[in-house]
């Protein structure tokens, strides 16, 4: 998943974990037309993580629709706190995930 030159000879597992720990993830709510709410997840490096696969995982766990585009994940509805819990379960450090109210 990671480029070998970025790891400096570290094992891929350690390099991948370091990459996850460096992510600063912001979760916010955006109001759209007709009062619809969309949860926006930003700050995940799309070069290191497959955003479409992560979006698919979140959509199935939350039973909602959504998409991954423009370097961010958009989920239909207000799922800010549940998304944070799922991202922590997937290995992202809780202190690097911010919910913007």
From Swiss-Prot:
Is this entry keyworded Protein biosynthesis? yes
Entry's SUPFAM superfamilies? eIF1-like
HAMAP family given for it?
A: SUI1
* Classification via PANTHER family: DENSITY-REGULATED PROTEIN, DENSITY-REGULATED PROTEIN HOMOLOG
Can you cite a GO biological process for this protein?
Answer: regulation of translation
Quote any Pfam family the record assigns: SUI1
Family, per entry: Belongs to the SUI1 family.
Which source organism does the UniProt entry give? Aeropyrum pernix (strain ATCC 700893 / DSM 11879 / JCM 9820 / NBRC 100138 / K1)
Q: Which GO terms describe its molecular function?
A: mRNA binding; translation initiation factor activity
The identity of this protein, by name, is Protein translation factor SUI1 homolog
Q: Which UniProt key words apply to this protein?
A: Protein biosynthesis, Translation regulation
């Amino acid at each position: 998943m990671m480029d070998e030159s970025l790891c400096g000879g570290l094992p891929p597992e350690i390099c991948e974990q370091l990459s996850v720990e460096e992510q600063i993830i912001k979760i916010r709510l955006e109001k759209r037309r007709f009062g619809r709410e969309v949860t926006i997840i930003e700050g995940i490096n799309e070069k290191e993580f497959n955003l479409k696969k992560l979006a698919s995982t979140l959509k199935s766990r939350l039973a909602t629709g959504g998409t991954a585009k423009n370097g961010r994940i958009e989920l239909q509805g207000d799922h800010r706190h549940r998304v944070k819990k799922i991202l922590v379960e997937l290995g992202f450090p809780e202190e690097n995930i911010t919910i913007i109210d």
